Amino acid sequence: MSEYSLFTSESVSEGHPDKIADQISDAVLDAIIAEDKFARVACETLVKTGVAIIAGEVTTTAWVDLEQIVRDVITDIGYTSSDVGFDGATCGVMNIIGKQSPDINQGVDRAKPEDQGAGDQGLMFGYASNETDVLMPAPITFSHQLVQRQAEARKSGLLPWLRPDAKSQVTCRYEGGKVVGIDAVVLSTQHNPDVSYADLREGVMELIVKHVLPAELLSKDTQFHINPTGQFIIGGPVGDCGLTGRKIIVDSYGGMARHGGGAFSGKDPSKVDRSAAYAGRYVAKNIVAAGLAERCEIQVSYAIGVAQPTSISLNTFGTGKISDDKIVKLVREIFDLRPYAITTMLDLLHPMYQETAAYGHFGRTPAQKTVGDDTFTTFTWEKTDRANDLRIAAGL
């Protein structure tokens, strides 16, 4: 980054229409993968006033109650009444999921699992930075924390007039590549019609904004825009149509790093749009955690049906302790970025995905989870367990 600059990122809450769609798509994936680890799933969702539509391609031996899954996700988010604009119990659910094309399947499946080809061509990026403790850019980290706190305050009854839909935006000021302040904060939250703007602003400022953002980064010059239109009663799928995969920058690095264009939600790990992006984050985070660089962006690319990446490249933006070419060599030695190897390395064949579909796929904390008889670790791509290997190999 320049010596003196501003950078802005945004996030949206779990009740935002596009995020409802993402969560439904990943809930469908989780339900199928819980019964059939090797299923092929590509699930897209559309939500609009009174209806949810799921579509896509699935190859599986599992049977799951797709309609109930859709309703449960909508209800759990908090859309339980026409008063809030959407009701999981009464909305229409349309299922138009079909089977995966055999043309794609023949390019992916192999006699030897490790030779599994990529499910599609494409390019994916991973990124990490030492500007926060989770090795993520500060603007997107703060933006996620704001809408996550909005959901907590709503669900706990702390601010009972809140409704599910919300958006946040944070502008950070950088000097010498380091965050030195927050210039602007935007938080728009859906609410019931009974709360006054004065009460809403005070509640949001005191119990959400100030609760989340570091006081040392706020100043008398920080701009706060709380529901800047003055009213946000109509929200959710009534206000806007929601679609899977429309918040790919929110899902990743808030615009701080490049994006290959492929969405994550609703896709099983054979789709490198998802699994290779997770692997890219894993590699970049371990490079930064190892102290090889302060910032790192890695790109990988694939051809459909081909196991080995067609390219691996990275940029440490002048912060590397060794050359970028040497780091690429270490990446090739230490990380196997073939699709099946990624799935094995990150232990991705578990129902872990719905949790990723709100508040970002990166910068999260790995945790042990049990679903039925299956116990596994979530957010495995956030581990830094290869940092020491990189450090030793680099001679640091």
Swiss-Prot record:
UniProt main location, coarse: cytoplasm
Positions bound to ATP: 16, 165-167, 240, 246-247, 263, 267
Sections of the chain in a coiled coil: none
Reactions catalysed according to its record: L-methionine + ATP + H2O = S-adenosyl-L-methionine + phosphate + diphosphate
Keyword list, A-Z: ATP-binding, Cytoplasm, Magnesium, Metal-binding, Nucleotide-binding, One-carbon metabolism, Potassium, Transferase
Gene3D superfamilies referenced in this protein's UniProt entry, alphabetically: 3.30.300.10
Pfam families attached to this UniProt entry: S-AdoMet_synt_C, S-AdoMet_synt_M, S-AdoMet_synt_N
Enzyme Commission number, as recorded: 2.5.1.6
Protein location: Cytoplasm
UniProt-annotated binding residues for K(+): 44
Keyword Iron-sulfur: no
Molecular function GO labels: ATP binding; magnesium ion binding; methionine adenosyltransferase activity
UniProt similarity note: Belongs to the AdoMet synthase family.
Protein name: S-adenosylmethionine synthase
Gene name in the database record: metK
